[in-house]
A protein has these predicted regions:
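Core segments of cupin and vicinal oxygen chelate
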Residues: 10-11, 17-54
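Vicinal oxygen chelate
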Residues: 1-7, 13-21, 45-46, 64-134, ...
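Short low-complexity stretches enriched in small and charged residues
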Residues: 2-12, 27-33, 64, 74-76
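Residues in flexible loops and secondary-structure boundaries
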Residues: 19, 26-28, 43, 55, ...
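Conserved short beta-strand elements that form part of the metal-binding/catalytic scaffold
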Residues: 36-70, 116-122
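Intrinsic-disorder/low-complexity coil detector
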Residues: 8, 15, 37, 60, ...
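Short, flexible segments with low predicted structural confidence
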Residues: 1-3, 18-19, 58-59
Length: 134
């Protein structure tokens, strides 16, 4: 088989890894958001909900980001209004659902360790009035 016919590699999934100060606190917080943990120990955890996963490492003070720094993960969703309502009782929400100029609507929340999760959903063209894709 020639090089031009070889199967090209693909990127299949991404699992952002966040630093957390307390693993049990992180697991409890994300449990309120509907995540479950198929694996965790004192220093590392994998959490999942639907088709996404996140990973945690307990932070090492010697490797902390600069003060005021944070980590951000964008998560594409469906039925964003229902998800927002699920998260209202957690007290973690930092914004209402807002439409963007690029054809999405979304909201964001922050965990106890300054990790930010942005949830977004594409708005159908007929709803947004904004052409998508340029």
């Amino acid at each position: 088989m020639s090089a031009s016919h070889e199967r090209q590699p693909t990127l299949d999934a991404v699992a952002p890894r966040f630093l957390v100060g307390d693993m049990e606190q992180a697991l409890a917080f994300y449990g309120q958001l509907g995540f479950t943990s198929p694996y965790h120990d004192e220093g590392f955890a994998i959490i999942e909900r639907d088709r996404i996963s996140l990973q945690f490492n307990v932070s090492d003070p010697a490797h902390e980001p600069p003060e005021g720094g944070c980590r951000v993960c964008y998560i594409s969703v469906t039925n964003i209004e229902a998800l927002y309502q699920q998260y209202v009782p957690t007290g973690a929400l930092r914004s209402p659902i807002q439409a963007t100029s690029w054809g999405t609507k979304g909201f964001w929340l922050c965990d106890p360790f300054r990790n930010i999760l942005i949830f977004g959903e594409s708005i159908p063209e007929e709803e947004s009035g904004t052409p998508q894709g340029g």
